[in-house]
Amino acid sequence: CRETIYNAIYALPVGELRKELIICLRQGKSSRRPRSGGVDRRGQIPDMVSIHVRPPEIEDRLMPGHWEGDLIKGKANASSVGTLVERTSGYLMLVKMRDATATSAMEGFSAALNRMPLAVRKSMTYDQGREMAKHAEITQNTGVAIYFCDPHSPWQRGSNENINGLIRQFLPKGTDLSVHSQEQLDEIAYL
C-alpha cells in the first residue's frame, strides 16, 4: 500500500538513500506537516449553501457537470489562478485572474463556466474563501448551483486539492502568477 511505502521512507535514518527516495515522492517533502484544528477567523459568506444539502448523486461522481473549484494564489497574494475540476471526468480548467478578489473570481469563473455546454454546468463545490462572496452572481450568470464545504475540510473537495498540488509543479508557490497567459494556463491544464 502507498502509505506503507511512505512510512518506510520516512523511517529511514538520515542519509543519502533517504534523500534520493524523498526526491522521488510525489510532493518531494521530507516530512508531513501535522494537521490540527484551528479557530475560524473568517466571516461567514452570505446565503451560502452547505455541502450537506448537496444532492447525493453529486457525491457518486456518476453524472458529469459537477465541479470542484479553488483559487491558487501567487506571490504576496497579488496574483491568482482559478482551478475548476469536473468531478466525473477530471477535466481541468485554469482561469487567469487579475487578483484574488470576489469580483475577479466571479468574472473569471462565470466566463469559464459559460464556455462549457449547459449539460455540464450543474453544480460547483467550493471552500469558504472570501473570493466566493459573490457566489450568487456566479449562479445567476451561469445557472450553476454552488455548495460550500465545511471550514478546514479540504477532503470534501479531494479532486481539486489533488490537482492543485500537481499544478504547483508548474506554478510554484511564491511566484508571480500574472506572468502566465491564459494560453499557457490552458497548456498546463492539458498536461
Describe each PLM feature range.
Residues 64-74:
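Two-metal-ion RNase H-like nuclease active-site motif
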Residues 79, 134-137, 159:
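Short, well-ordered secondary-structure micro-motifs
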Residues 2-59:
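Basic, flexible linker segments flanking DNA-binding modules
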Residues 73-77, 94-118:
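Active-site beta-loop-alpha junctions of metal-dependent nucleic acid enzymes
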Residues 119-134, 152:
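Acidic/histidine-rich, metal-coordinating catalytic segments
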Residues 59, 72, 76-93:
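Short conserved beta-strand segments at catalytic cores or DNA/RNA-binding microdomains
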Residues 129, 139-146, 150-191:
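Charged alpha-helix within mobile-element recombinases
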